[in-house]
A protein has these predicted regions:
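Extracytoplasmic cell-surface/polysaccharide-interacting catalytic and binding patches
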Residues: 1-198
Length: 198
């Protein structure tokens, strides 16, 4: 397979890998601009500027399919990540929390490039973890078009052995349009990109 780094048509600016083997490094993100927005539960959250711009384009496209999407989570600092883990332990149990919430320092949400998406049904935002059977079929409608807006489904089905994170139909990651298109066409994960180029 062609080495992506040698393809001048593919922009790798946003192709930073954060996972359990590659912890978050704040220096990698100093070049990006961040903005404040409102989450689906009306909290003020932070997201990378270009990521949000392309999310709005994706949102407009989904409206044409009568699907309303919004952002529940974007950037989370380490304190917020630990708090989320503790909340999940209380609500869903430690085993589930250990699977679904990445350890502090290894979450893509530290970057502001990863978004957890919720859908609105009957004028109400629906929790993914509590209503998976309802939201998953709706969220799947956006998966085939994510790459057109520079996003990938970060944790697709049957990828847990590589990503170490179970299937999350709501978790999308901005990597830029050219790379997203390449990964989509070649059915690759972000980890595969690194294995090819390192």
């Amino acid at each position: 397979m062609q080495n992506i780094m040698k393809n001048d048509n593919i922009n790798t600016t946003y192709a930073i890998l954060v996972n359990r083997k590659n912890p978050y490094n704040a220096k990698d993100y100093e070049k990006f601009k961040y903005i404040n927005i409102k989450s689906t539960d009306n909290r003020e959250i932070i997201v990378e500027n270009i990521t949000y711009k392309h999310f709005l384009e994706l949102k407009d496209e989904m409206k044409k399919e009568n699907v309303i999407i919004g952002i529940k989570h974007a950037l989370r600092d380490k304190i917020e990540q630990q708090s989320l883990y503790e909340q999940f332990c209380i609500k869903y149990g430690k085993d589930y929390a250990d699977k679904i919430v990445c350890p502090v320092g290894t979450s893509e949400h530290h970057t502001g490039l990863a978004l957890d998406i919720e859908v609105k049904i009957d004028n109400e935002w629906i929790s993914n973890n509590d209503n998976f059977d309802i939201t998953e079929p709706i969220l799947k409608k956006m998966h085939p078009i994510l790459h057109k807006y520079g996003f990938i489904l970060r944790y697709p089905k049957n990828s847990e052995k590589i990503t170490k994170v179970p299937y999350e139909p709501w978790h999308i990651r901005y990597i830029g349009k050219s790379l997203a298109q390449y990964l989509y066409e070649n059915k690759l994960l972000l980890e595969d990109f690194y294995n090819i180029n390192n």
